[in-house]
Amino acid sequence: MAEKVSFEEGKLQVPDKPVIPYIEGDGVGQDIWKNAQIVFDKAIAKVYGGHKQVIWREVLAGKKAYNETGNWLPNETLEIIKTHLLAIKGPLETPVGGGIRSLNVALRQELDLFACVRPVRYFKGVPSPLKHPEKTAITIFRENTEDIYAGIEWNAGTAEVQKVINFLQDDMQVKKIRFPKSSSIGIKPISIEGSQRLIRAAIEYALANNLTKVTLVHKGNIQKFTEGGFRKWGYELAKREYAAELASGQLVVDDIIADNFLQQILLKPERFDVVALTNLNGDYASDALAAQVGGIGISPGANINYQTGHAIFEATHGTAPDIAGQDLANPSSVLLSGCMLFDYIGWSKVSDLIMKAVEKAIANGQVTIDFAKELGVEALTTRQFSEVLLTYL
């Protein structure tokens, strides 16, 4: 019988036939999702022989939702994901004009999905600008709900920004606004709770996956109390809650300035296992690391609240409207995000099967047009690529 996934006493309770919502996505979402779903279902059937099955339930967001309901992110969609805990999604178009700045950010903030998790690894055969891309194997934990992504800012020349500037200058005695008459102002909230729950999740992930080092990435040399606070609170958490693991050497927690980190992931990526970052730094680092191993077209991602069990797994690339509906898009990002979903619900054999199929296809030069051009091989369509994966399952 189809049932919802539940979360009890800090653990997911997964029935044999869980109902999992999906958002097809805009642009190439129509191409990648339908092909990925076929691969998911075949892998589940191969592993469990019909004893387990995902019941996929479509929910609306993005352009499809707007066309059908007049709302880019319907309340019904949020409620369904809240009650079902999990979802997987394709890329979403950002609405033009006022209102929601980003549907992806809105989903993360509405559901308090505080950890953006991106495992970055190299697949043999993927074109990369690096001589040794195989040395890059880093899992990113990016804080998802704070920092400048809170969207607290005021436009230059408005009465609102003038109130803020007057308060800063008159009440707080701030002297460092260089051009107060023409400045926009933004606020960067970073909290103890927000920082520590993210860093705790990163440490727990490292310990669960036999990884030793968790590195705190920050700009505390410039922003002493926000970025510096992230670093400080991370060390305090580690010493308070993981003293035994630190003492035994099972866990090492260190830190690095963000700009140096962006150098070191090119020069010595092997020195990092798991990295925890504030929101903006995490945004930069996620895409920079993805470029080292083939780009965001093959990068999976998940947005997770480890305290409630809620999680959305997603294709990390954009909508690519120039190739939408043409059966050209690489479905690997949503496929590998599906692998993260299956790992999350404890169906790791399904994840392993799909991962090995993707590895084999790429190693054999059976790739979509994004990689085929650089490898000098004939490009497969989205459908052909998924059919190749089916033969490898």
Curated annotation (Swiss-Prot):
The record marks 149, 219 as: Critical for catalysis. GO terms for molecular function: isocitrate dehydrogenase (NADP+) activity; magnesium ion binding; NAD binding. The keyword Metal-binding applies. One of its GO terms (biological process) is glyoxylate cycle. Disulfide bonds: none annotated. It catalyses: D-threo-isocitrate + NADP(+) = 2-oxoglutarate + CO2 + NADPH. SMART domains: Iso_dh (SM01329). Keywords: Glyoxylate bypass, Magnesium, Manganese, Metal-binding, NADP, Oxidoreductase, Tricarboxylic acid cycle. Its cofactor is Mg(2+); Mn(2+). D-threo-isocitrate binds at residues 102, 104, 108, 118, 142. Mg(2+) binds at residue 283. The keyword Disulfide bond does not apply. InterPro entries: IsoCit/isopropylmalate_DH_CS, Isocitrate_DH_NADP_dimer_prok, IsoPropMal-DH-like_dom. Its EC number is 1.1.1.42. Binds 1 Mg(2+) or Mn(2+) ion per subunit. Homodimer. NCBIfam families: PRK07006.1, prok_nadp_idh. Belongs to the isocitrate and isopropylmalate dehydrogenases family. PANTHER family: ISOCITRATE DEHYDROGENASE [NADP]. Catalyzes the oxidative decarboxylation of isocitrate to 2-oxoglutarate and carbon dioxide with the concomitant reduction of NADP(+). This is Isocitrate dehydrogenase [NADP]. The lineage of its organism: Bacteria, Bacillati, Bacillota, Bacilli, Lactobacillales.
